[in-house]
Amino acid sequence: MTQIAIYPGTFDPFTNGHLDVFERASNIFDSVVVVIAENSRKNTLFSVDERREMIEKIIGRYPGARVEVLHDGLLADYARQVGAKAIVRGVRQVKDFEYEFQMSLLNRQLNPDVTTVFLMPNVKYTYVASSIIREVAMLGGDVHNFVHPNVLEKLHEKYNVCKGQSNT
């Protein structure tokens, strides 16, 4: 039986920290579905379609990997719908864990068949967050160590920044 996990997030943008957690999950589960949460309360830089395209280019070479969008509804219900037995969450610090632990308990109540699996990224990504990447890129900083080249290109397009040059 195929063990399916879902890896949800906004992924605006998908960072090397996200990729690291995805790769770790891929070593545990037969199939990992990256689920882009469309959250109308968040003001995102990239559209859902842009995020999907970027992530598909990055994870497309992994067996059992796919990208889907959760437009509305509960993650616990989505997990049931796709037959996922696990929800993968990356945890960088204690603050992340506190929030994710609460969400894990809620998801368990809503869907007792799904388990949340907490994975820590490589230590070099523990301070990397999409919001920080967006801000540094917007200010012309070099983020090439924190995102895939295809994401870097899209950030440059969004912020009209030439590679290796700041916008000042």
From Swiss-Prot:
InterPro entries: Cyt_trans-like, PPAT, Rossmann-like_a/b/a_fold. This is Phosphopantetheine adenylyltransferase. Homohexamer. It comes from Prosthecochloris aestuarii (strain DSM 271 / SK 413). The keyword Cytoplasm applies. Belongs to the bacterial CoaD family. One of its GO terms (molecular function) is pantetheine-phosphate adenylyltransferase activity. Its cofactor is Mg(2+). Pathway: Cofactor biosynthesis; coenzyme A biosynthesis; CoA from (R)-pantothenate: step 4/5.
